[in-house]
Amino acid sequence: GSSEEALLARLALRSMKQAKYTTECMGHFGLAANYYTHFTSPIRRYPDLQIHRIIKENLHGGLTKKRIAHYEKILPEVAIWTSSRERLADEAERETDKAKKVQFMERHIGEEFTGVISGISNYGFYVELPNTVEGMVRLANLDGDYYVFDEEHYELVGERTRKKFKLGQTVKIQVVSVDRYLKTIDFLPVRNFDKR
């Protein structure tokens, strides 16, 4: 339930290999099952429809050698095509979410919020708010010190002040700008606030 727990869950999910449809029996890691297929009901995706058809055909005794050969011929291409379509759909969903979050935060420019540092790089850090909006604090916009990215400890450290911005750290920010075209939100930390 903590902000750190949510962050760790998201980072673990991001680090996992992206799922794809395949004709190979690979089991299910999370369920520790050697044999696995998935489908949703009601049917939401073409692979769900395809596996429903195959299971129904098998239950009714229609899965003959000829039909199995047919599926062995067409399903590898179906798996590749549907995996690529799903990646495109996921990307469209992410872009739509970003656009709506930018549009929402446009009304909150100048306001202050408390969030958690969700990502760090050599050019800044990301802060995620409790409402899942994520914005960037750019190092170029930070006054009073020069911050260096410590990749080993996943933190930014001020050369002069030794002030640190660490992954999972709670920070108070102010919304300074949004860009609808780039779908970005810029934050600045509010001074003298550090819960760690």
Question: How would you describe each model-predicted region?
Answer:
Residues 162-167:
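Divalent-cation-assisted or electrostatically stabilized phosphate/pyrophosphate-binding catalytic cores
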Residues 191-196:
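Short peripheral tails and domain-boundary helices/loops at the edges of structured domains
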Residues 1-130, 136-151, 169, 174-177, ...:
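Append "with occasional cross-activation on large, charged helical scaffolds in nucleic-acid assemblies
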Residues 100-101, 156-161:
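Short alpha-helix capping/helix-loop boundary micro-motifs
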